[in-house]
Amino acid sequence: MTKNIVNTALVLVGAGSLLTGCNFEQPETNCFVQESPSWAVKYDVVDSPKDANGDECTTTAPLVELMGVYKYVNPETGAAQLALRPATLASRAIADTTTTSADQTSLGSLDTEPKDHGFCHANDFAPAFVNVAASDTAAANTIRYEFTNVRVYSAAVAPGTQFTGELKYTSNGCTSSYVMRAVWPPAPCDTASTEPAENCGVGSGLNPEFAVVCQPTSATGTTGYCVPAGDIPSFK
């Protein structure tokens, strides 16, 4: 059983995807994942970038980016899988004739039932990568994502709309490690705005019970995406 990850469209926008309330002891659901071509993902650095010789280097993962997230279930075995497709890879895939969409997407095994505190664990992810051809101003490069210990929060209060995990990111020969904090839907924001709808507040489209902050896409900019403010699950 296969699905075309690149062309998969968001088809599930049910009333349960934006739940409110503060009773976090509601009955658990199965391992639900909000499938979408765009989640907002924040990367918190754990280990600074180093090259193959262990020397410090400067290339890092994005501060925040969009990521495609999809769940697949084998109808014959019932086994579930989770697919992660970072925008950094997808945006460069068009110019890469040496890899396929399968190479550019990380696929791992996913629990079928929540375990501890409403989390569904996903592991055994294959690395995802693209090869960037050399240009007049830059050498050839391989950008590589390696995900581990991914945990989707699937409790009934907010089923499948937040996840966390670990990332090892390599680009330009620099490798660094991060903890991920991700939320759906992706809400654009502007730290310079006083309008709640433009700064992760009322009207942003996010679950009003989520504790979120605006993370600019660059260190000097003001525009970016709303991301979880704390550890997952991030609630007020």
UniProtKB/Swiss-Prot annotation:
Classify the protein's membrane topology as the record does: Lipid-anchor
List the protein's name: Putative lipoprotein MlpA
Q: Where in the cell is it found?
A: Cell membrane
Q: Which gene encodes it?
A: mlpA
Q: Record's Gene Ontology CC terms?
A: plasma membrane
Q: Which domain of life is it from?
A: Bacteria
Covalently attached lipid (N-palmitoyl cysteine), positions: 22
Q: Between which residues do disulfide bridges form? A: none
UniProt signal peptide: 1-21
Lipid-attached positions, S-diacylglycerol cysteine: 22
Annotated keywords = Cell membrane, Lipoprotein, Membrane, Palmitate, Signal
Q: What is its main location?
A: membrane
